Amino acid sequence: MYPAHLLVLLAVCVSLLGAASIPPQPLNLVQFSYLIQCANHGSRATWHYTDYGCYCGKGGSGTPVDELDRCCKTHDDCYTEAGKKGCYPKLTLYSWKCTGKAPTCNSKTGCKRTVCDCDATAAKCFAKAPYNNKNYNIDTKKRCQ
């Protein structure tokens, strides 16, 4: 083997090792973002909901700061209940469509239906709830006790 080939092989191995340490993104969250866009008609980018209040985004504690944050807490609770039924909400993919500018679940039964219902209900709740910029990226240690 030529030295240049060894360098290429080494570079590939190093890049694969680096990629192995990157945690995978839950597949369902991509689908959930599409449901949100369907429900709010694209009026607000999905990332606006990833660090909002005490419950929108990773984790959650304390009292929700407003109606939108309550939507996120309800969604978290729905995922918890789905998990108790043996579902893996963040990994469960389901069938849905955007009808009448609202997400509709096509999956009929089981975990796919349960998780889709959680996501569709949350997406519709997000679309109806007012968005308060002051509740984006708040200090959760102070406000979410």
UniProtKB/Swiss-Prot annotation:
Q: Where is the signal peptide?
A: 1-19
- List residues traversing the bilayer: none
* UniProt GO MF annotations: calcium ion binding; calcium-dependent phospholipase A2 activity; phospholipid binding; toxin activity
Q: Where in the cell is it found?
A: Secreted
Q: Which GO terms describe its biological process?
A: arachidonate secretion; lipid catabolic process; phospholipid metabolic process
Alphabetically ordered keywords of this record: Calcium, Disulfide bond, Hemostasis impairing toxin, Hydrolase, Lipid degradation, Lipid metabolism, Metal-binding, Platelet aggregation inhibiting toxin, Secreted, Signal, Toxin
Question: Which cofactors go with this protein?
Answer: Ca(2+)
Described purpose of this protein according to its UniProt entry: Snake venom phospholipase A2 (PLA2) that inhibits collagen-induced platelet aggregation. PLA2 catalyzes the calcium-dependent hydrolysis of the 2-acyl groups in 3-sn-phosphoglycerides.
Could you tell me what this protein is called?
Basic phospholipase A2 S10-58F
